[in-house]
Amino acid sequence: MTAVTRFAPSPTGFLHVGGARTALYSWLYAKSQGGKFVLRIEDTDIERSTQEAIDAILEGMEWLGLTWDDGPYYQTKRFDRYKALINEMLEEGKAYKCFMSSAELDEIREKQKANGEKPRYPGTWRDRTDHPEGEPFVIRFKNPLEGKVLVKDHIRGNIEIANSELDDLIILRSDGTPTYNFCVVVDDWDMGITHVVRGEDHINNTPRQINILQALGAPVPEYAHVSMILGDDGKKLSKRHGAVSVMQYRDDGFLPQALLNYLVRLGWSYGDQEIFSKEEMIELFSLDAIGQSASAFNTDKLIWLNQHYIKELPVSEVLPYAKWHFEQQGIDVSNGPALEEVIKVQADRVKTLKELAEISGYFYQEYEDFDEKAAKKHLRPVAQEPLEAVKAALMALSTWNAETIHEAINKTAETLGVGMGKVGMPLRVAATGSGNSPSLDVTLNLLKPEQIAQRIDKALIYIANRQQS
């Protein structure tokens, strides 16, 4: 049997990290088994579903590299299929029309609560045939009254639920639209889904869906209900814990490789291994190795992984993501050194790609002002002579590379009888606008001699103005 999994988000918001982890687990299982991964958009909640949310989900999946083999399918385009099956179930006595109003049902539920009973529909219209003409109705599934439902779960083991605990589920609303629980069942059947990986909040739906599948004569898939993700305070992950949208992590400068590696470890493990390439995930992943307990989201751990991937991935893999961040900050990387070279020299110095773009602008455009703290400390009148001397030494170079630049700076310090810092730090502030950069010879080598000359002149003007004020 070929494994077929699915990710089936509701388009009522962005793709959050919990949904992304579910999608990843589904995708990994399909790939590990040589199977198929289906993307389905469960948009039956017409009032809350938006095209903007659909676009955000698709964008998030594509950015993560979780490509789908089939789909995306949309439930709203399959209403005719659902209704045809509901009519068949009506004819076969597996479903029935219920004319109970919402007010009547609310009244019954309040009485049940007052009596300490579980609120539920009492089956009033289950066997009635005295249907009032012209009155609104819903269609309910005739859930079995006796016996048990067995849910075979890869994560939680076998779960048994007595049918007496389940009421008759609405499968068609009074406005003629099918409900979520029915659409899911039909879709899983039609799409040949063999393994359903989803959040633990769906456990209560599962026995109902199994009963509908069996009533339709459809095969029952295997299930894996994943525990929720908590914040570091032990509460359900929410916006107060930081970013929860996948694309917010992109905007904040995280690599998809880092986020995937982090998400796969939120519940699944393979020995003590922390770093997993996508290929390793596919090779090693199994549903049975997912833990039952909830996982806590730790942003510091994600940042550590992101730093690792920025440093360790081939520059060619980091390049397109880095370039996007430079573009977001209005930096044209065609106006300077090859971005690959900038990534190489900055990779050890940054936690995110957003930070990379923020601290590397001076390679591609003129900085407006000096960093105030750095200029105050290093662009003092005493720095005028070293700057003038090192400018002359650098401009006299016939060959411009890191080695000759390093030698010129060293010789300038020796000639002036001062330490390297007395030359190097003012030069660094002049060249970059700040007191932080990769090694000075490497930094200057990525810039042009004429840029260095202009920036040293800018620093000398700053010093002169400082003397006059």
From Swiss-Prot:
PANTHER family: GLUTAMATE--TRNA LIGASE, GLUTAMATE--TRNA LIGASE, MITOCHONDRIAL-RELATED. GO terms for biological process: glutamyl-tRNA aminoacylation. A motif ('HIGH' region) lies at residues 9-19. It is found in: Cytoplasm. It comes from the Bacteria. ATP binds at residue 239. CDD domains: GluRS_core. Monomer. It catalyses: tRNA(Glu) + L-glutamate + ATP = L-glutamyl-tRNA(Glu) + AMP + diphosphate. Belongs to the class-I aminoacyl-tRNA synthetase family. Glutamate--tRNA ligase type 1 subfamily. This is Glutamate--tRNA ligase. The gene is gltX. One of its GO terms (molecular function) is glutamate-tRNA ligase activity. Its EC number is 6.1.1.17.
